[in-house]
Amino acid sequence: MGRQPCCDKLGVKKGPWTAEEDKKLISFILTNGQCCWRAVPKLAGLKRCGKSCRLRWTNYLRPDLKRGLLSDAEEKLVIDLHSRLGNRWSKIAARLPGRTDNEIKNHWNTHIKKKLLKMGIDPVTHEPLKKEANLSDQPTTESDQNKENGHQQVQVVPQSTNVTAAAATSTEFDNNSSFSSSASSSENSSCTTDESKLVFDNLSENDPLLSCLLEADTPLIDSPWEFPMSSTTTVEEPKSFDSIISNMTSWEDTFNWLSGYQEFGINDFGFDNCFNHVELDIFKTIDNVENRHG
């Protein structure tokens, strides 16, 4: 809820005060003193609100009120208070007896602010304006100098030198990359060859066939191969050719059953229905030729 209104707005007079209203308000306050401003209009016989009575007394009718412009001492005090309090005019007016906050604010905006600007002082921060101007000009001057230097460098350095420098850097980069790649590939190949040599050496030591194939001097064909034998194996003496032949049976004894079937022809096995006349004639001629030579 907001503040309650000081009076009923019905029947309240607005606008400038008359001389009769000023006399009634002055006589009431001088005889009764300052009291609740909401009750003053009814007690003094005025058709005004309490706020209007208070402002009229404070700003225009009180006896200690000073008229006219502020003195030099008052202006210095206002500047000092404004640097510490800012635009809190009511607090500044409390330090200046006989002066109202509205009067001090009007005097500040019309007179004191212009004096401070002429003196080169900022009326808001109360600091010299030259320092701020110098600080604001420094980055602009530095940027302008950098732009000018960069423009001069671009004009002095020709375009061909930039191209050649870029080409030189690119060729150096390519050479370095190719050298590093070749070095890495050679290292990898050397590592793989060393590993393969170790593997082949181990295999050749364990396997006589591989050791024979990997030898620089080829061995004679007639030289016997010596394979590793375990301790449990026994070496048999070589047998003579006559003993091998005597143990073998004759071909006739072994394949005696085959000679009995040599006399059969194709018709005996029932193949006459499987072949045509031409094929049968071929088989007959083959049999006749074999019988002749046999």
UniProtKB/Swiss-Prot annotation:
Residues 9-61, 62-116 form the HTH myb-type domain. Residues 37-61, 89-112 bind DNA. PROSITE patterns: HTH_MYB (PS51294). Restricted to the petals, with the highest expression in the limb, probably in both epidermal and mesophyll cell layers. The gene is ODO1. R2R3 MYB-type transcription factor controlling the production of volatile organic compounds (VOCs), including floral volatile benzenoids and phenylpropanoids (FVBP), in flowers of fragrant cultivars (e.g. cv. Mitchell and cv. V26) by regulating the shikimate pathway, via the activation of several genes (e.g. EPSPS, ADT1, PAL1, CFAT and CCoAOMT1). This scent, mostly produced in the evening and night by the petals, attracts the pollinators (e.g. the night-active hawkmoth pollinator Manduca sexta). Keywords: Activator, Biological rhythms, DNA-binding, Nucleus, Repeat, Transcription, Transcription regulation. Induction: In fragrant cultivars (e.g. cv. Mitchell and cv. V26), increases before the onset of volatile emission at the end of the light period, peaks at night and decreases when volatile emission declines early morning; this precise expression regulation of its promoter is tuned by EOBI and EOBII binding and activation to a MYB binding site (MBS) 5'-AAACCTAAT-3' and by LHY binding and repression to cis-regulatory evening elements. GO terms for molecular function: transcription cis-regulatory region binding. Its main location: nucleus. It comes from the Eukaryota. Disruption phenotype: Reduced expression of genes involved in the biosynthesis of precursors from the shikimate pathway (e.g. PAL1, DAHPS, EPSPS, CCoAOMT1 and CM) thus leading to a lower accumulation of volatile benzenoids but seems to not affect the production of anthocyanins implicated in flower color. Increased levels of EOBI. The keyword Nucleus applies. Residues 128-152, 171-191 are annotated as: Disordered. One of its GO terms (cellular component) is nucleus. InterPro entries: Homeodomain-like_sf (IPR009057), Myb_dom (IPR017930), Myb_TF_plants (IPR015495), SANT/Myb (IPR001005). One of its GO terms (biological process) is regulation of DNA-templated transcription. It is found in: Nucleus. This is MYB-like transcription factor ODO1.
